């Protein structure tokens, strides 16, 4: 019997940040006899029949760690094919002293630009670091393996062809400086017929301080009436929002591999992005120079249509959730 342990912060399709993780869980479960999910928060009804969920929720960080290890230990004794830690290096670090003596492979899935001591330490104890692209993790290590993003393409209908001019622009992502929303607002000032709708969570004090600054900038640029600053949305609402848009904008700085870019592409929408990581997905007409609003505005103005179906095909071929799950299992075999 093949058994896999998957550790994440939330296994809940309504979570605005981690809702897409449930599709990954289902794809993994389809390829093993039993999948054990350990998470702080779990929506049991969302898990497949061959999936067992254990919550390690607790009021304190120490309590969560203790409950996590208490749930993990008996699963390791049953010798799973691997433990996959999702996005949080601390899960791999805590698991290592228990997994290594039993020779249970340990994998970390990580796609953020920000690293830190926990990630550096986790790299030393895991067998493999899985990510979207070798550039989408702040590491240089032979342990890094690119396996695509794991997009649930079937959940994202292909919208009708969007022809220019693109008037209804959409941005999805945190209200954080790294997301480059100031660049997008300044580009909007050069597109007098366009509107912009933003939706995203505010996860930190810095995020909560940044949103009012963006609202003030919109007023300063005289685009306030054309911008909607929305809150975080449940993951299930994303296909609907994409269906309302003419195009998606993503100005995240650095080597970002933001999931929304792949989701928009899978929806056959033109998506304009600045990260170099998208050079294998987006044609030149959809890629702009980060921090240069005029570059983004010009790309939107000059878009002549036709990119949608090819974008979806590329996501399906290289970034589908089924392909992702298969590559995870191959990496820990």
Question: Which residues fall in each region the model found?
Answer:
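Active-site donor-binding acidic/aromatic loop of nucleotide-activated sugar
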Residues: 205-211, 224-234, 241
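Glycosyltransferase donor-sugar binding loop
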Residues: 40-42, 195-213
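Short hydrophobic beta-strand element within catalytic cores of glycosyltransferases
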Residues: 268-274
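A conserved mid-protein helix/loop that constitutes part of the nucleotide-sugar donor-binding site
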Residues: 19-26, 176-194, 209-212
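Conserved donor-binding/catalytic core segment of Leloir-type glycosyltransferases
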Residues: 5-7, 162-179, 185-191, 197-199
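A charged, aromatic-enriched C-terminal amphipathic alpha-helix characteristic of glycosyltransferases
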Residues: 302-332
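Aromatic "clamp/platform" in nucleotide-sugar-dependent glycosyltransferases that forms part
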Residues: 253
